[in-house]
Amino acid sequence: MNSTDSVRHFEQKGSKLLKEFRDFAMKGNVVDLAVGVIIGAAFGGIVTSLVGDVIMPIISAITGGLDFSNYFTALSKSVTANTLAEAKKQGAVLAWGNFLTVTLNFLIIAAVLFAVIRSLNKLKQQAEETKSPPPTPTRQEELLTEIRDLLKKGAGPSP
């Protein structure tokens, strides 16, 4: 095999591999999954903003100005800072306020997704319920069905 044949061989293999990849990537499930991941990432940003910019300030106002993201417990005596960022620089801290915020984010995402999926399931169920039943067969169709069934049983007219 000379070098020209080798190049052609690799071009054919590469072309086949590229075609297989394109076919795989263009399947509905893969494209749907990619769209879902992108929308999910954007939705995560919305929920993070909802928690950080709307819900937590309301909770903070109700609790007298508490900022949960800066709540921590020092695990080292050398930690004397008042903010989480500074405390982390000084030593080991248990950042339970940040954990509380992240947990709240998760619970809100889970609740919203549950509500969306529940609504979609209800819409799907309503669509199935509103489907019209199949039309009743005409008299001619009933007779033809009876004849077909009799022929299947072998009970046709005898000669």
From Swiss-Prot:
GO terms for cellular component: plasma membrane. The keyword Transport applies. The chain crosses the membrane at residues 35-55, 97-117. Keywords: Cell inner membrane, Cell membrane, Ion channel, Ion transport, Membrane, Transmembrane, Transmembrane helix, Transport. GO terms for molecular function: mechanosensitive monoatomic ion channel activity. It is a multi-pass membrane protein. InterPro entries: Mechanosensitive_channel_CS (IPR019823), MS_channel (IPR001185), MSC/AndL (IPR037673), MscL_channel (IPR036019). It is found in: Cell inner membrane. NCBIfam families: mscL, PRK00567.1-4, PRK13952.1. Channel that opens in response to stretch forces in the membrane lipid bilayer. May participate in the regulation of osmotic pressure changes within the cell. Homopentamer. Belongs to the MscL family. HAMAP family: MscL. This is Large-conductance mechanosensitive channel.
